[in-house]
Every structure is written in structure tokens, then in C-alpha cells.
């Protein structure tokens, strides 16, 4: 998150804590909802559930508004709430073992790779999404927070309640598993592109 965005969030946080400013609360919601949605939906595999959890995150923020000035990093604070809600949801799901296949197909993670760095076929994108989706829970959460939500290692360590070294190790494991899983051969892809012209 940019310094300007961080300063703005801190300003909104103060307005909410001191004055119960509903306009600041709405702006905070608009600012943090998109990254929270990507994070939660990547874990719970359900867009409607993710939307509901975002509401729950902000209800908790509003309920704790008097104490918000004590929160050092509201962005991290919201992601910790989101993580806990997501894990609680998954635990309930595991107990009931009821899965909705449509939710899985709707929420394949949308891994972004800069097109200037790499031409990628639709099939390769699908393979990458499946590889990310098949990562173990903690690896996937760390990968999502760092690669899709642009959190720093230290912030992820705070969110996950683990050491920075563990974050580094888990990200390395995630990247290795993704790489192995997709069995990517750049030279072969480039040859196919040159021969077919696609």
C-alpha cells in the first residue's frame, strides 16, 4: 500500500475513533473492500461468502471504533480479522463437508503476470491458477497476501502471527510448488509462438 494511502487510512481511522465519522467509515470501506474481497474469496472460494465476511470485518471495526486509535496499522488489523473469519468459515465447512462446485469455478484466483514480461497462453494461465489453488492453506494465504495484495513480509507476519523468516520460507515453498506444478518450459513456449505465430 502506498504511503499516501496509508496516511489517508490513518486519517480515516482517527476520524472514526474520535468523532464516529460515518463518512470516514464509508471511505474506509470503499478503500479496503477490494483487497479484502480478493483475499477472502481466494480462501473461502465463495464470492457471496466473501462479501458477507467483508461486512463482518467492517462491523467489527465499527464496534471497536473507540479503540481504533490504539491500532498501529488498520490495514493489517482488517486483514487479521478477515483471516480469522475465513479460517473459522473453513473449519465449519470442513465439519459439514458441504462444498458447492460452482463457487470453486467462480473463484479461481486471478493471478496477474505482466504481459510485457511473459506471453502466456490461456492454458498456461489455467495451470497457474490451479497450481495456486492447490497450495496448502498457509502457503496460499501468504502467496495471496504478498503477490496479490502487495503486503510486505513484516505485515504478513503480523497478519498470520508468524515470524518474517517463516513468511519467507512459506513463500519460497509456494513459488517452488507453483513452478513445479505448471512444469513451465519458456523455450518450448517461445518456439511454439514463433512457429504458429500465435
Segments predicted by a language model, with ranges:
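Helix-turn-helix DNA-binding module
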Residues: 130-133, 137, 141, 149-166
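Structural recognition of an alpha-helix C-terminal capping motif at a helix-to-coil junction
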Residues: 38, 52-59, 72-84
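Short, charged helix-capping/linker segments at alpha-helix termini
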Residues: 17-27, 37-56
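C-terminal edge and immediately downstream basic/flexible tail or linker adjoining helix-turn-helix-like DNA-binding
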Residues: 3-4, 158-159, 175-198
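Sigma70-family region 2
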Residues: 17-18, 58-73, 92
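Arg/Lys-rich amphipathic alpha helix in sigma70-family domain 2
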Residues: 80-99
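Internal acidic/polar
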Residues: 6-10, 96-118
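N-terminal module of bacterial RNA polymerase sigma factors
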Residues: 1-35, 116, 198
